[in-house]
Amino acid sequence: MFVTAPEIQWIRDDASLAQQCREWRTQPYLALDTEFMRVDTFYPAAGLVQVGDGRREWLIDPLLVRDWGPFAELLEDPRVVKVLHACSEDLEVFLRLTGSLPVPLFDTQLAAAYLGMAHSMGYSKLVKEVLDIDLPKDETRSDWLQRPLTEMQMRYAADDVQHLAQVYLALDARLSEEKRAWLLEDGAELVANLCRESDPREAYREVKLGWRLRPQQLAVLRELCAWREEQARLRNRPRNHVLRERTLWPLARLLPKNKTDLAAIEDMHPRTVRQDGDFLIELIAEAARLPQSEWPEALPEPLPPEVTPLLKSLRAIGQREAETLGMAPELMLRKKILEALLKSGYPHGPYELPDSLRGWRRERMGQALLNALESA
């Protein structure tokens, strides 16, 4: 059934969604947004999905819709451009609801940066700059799982995709064909990264100071991090609710043998000791007994402070390219990419471009980076 508030159409059942998805798939683009709650959960809880085609706005109630198959097909339809803004969490909502992600993806925050506007520009600021409209902020933190939603919430949600469609048309008209292709390439990479669900057994590589642990201790850290990641997903609780991040390194280094030792670990929550203490003690003991053949390799040390001038010279290559192209410099070369490049051969070389430097960035700046390192 379609229930209409002023200029807003509600979709609250599977048949209506399927019917509307057929119509949406005839459109050249759709503006999409979500409202969700993520207070004490691992996954976002969807409260609303908004769709706009530039003329009308729809609100889909995810608390009532059960069959998301037609919407998943819409998201994957390559003929319809999906327009979102700063959409990493929206993508998580779509993946959780439908099992699919939007392609092709046009992120208006990225588009603004491609046009030389500020990097990581907030939605309200972008709407003000492009459309000269001041958006109300009253509803950004409201409860989107409550029913009924207030008139203010519904208006706010519908206005979001109405203005998003207008912003898209304004920005898209200013993008060169080349920049538009790069922007969609970035959107595709964002989607691909989310599709590659992170391996829980690789999470230990991100722990601060992990490089200071011996391989046997790293085996313990690996098992702790994998358990933490798996339990966060299983329990739908934040990782730090399962086991606080600051406890991981001392647990792997000190190898507590009983609950008293466990409770003495700095920042260890009493709830964790009470609920999971016995299991953690056994997990640590088992991981510490693993044969050497199952230990991870030592993690690489961080780059020394003396690479700072070299990093600056590499970053300058990206800044010069940004000036040439009229783009925000932050779009060019992420710090992680430059650090990976340096780690491939520092201090004496040879250096190798990391796989994370892809597409147009690799084509336009890859050789210049290698040349700069050769002459350093």
Swiss-Prot record:
Keywords: Cytoplasm, Exonuclease, Hydrolase, Nuclease, tRNA processing. InterPro entries: 3'-5'_exonuclease_dom (IPR002562), HRDC-like_sf (IPR010997), HRDC_dom (IPR002121), HRDC_dom_sf (IPR044876), RNase_D (IPR006292), RNase_D-like (IPR051086), RNaseH-like_sf (IPR012337), RNaseH_sf (IPR036397). Belongs to the RNase D family. NCBIfam families: rnd. Its main location: cytoplasm. It comes from Pseudomonas paraeruginosa (strain DSM 24068 / PA7) (Pseudomonas aeruginosa (strain PA7)). PANTHER family: RIBONUCLEASE D (PTHR47649:SF1). It is an enzyme of class 3 (hydrolase). Its EC number is 3.1.13.5. GO terms for molecular function: 3'-5' exonuclease activity; nucleic acid binding; nucleotide binding; ribonuclease D activity. It comes from the Bacteria. This is Ribonuclease D. GO terms for cellular component: cytoplasm.
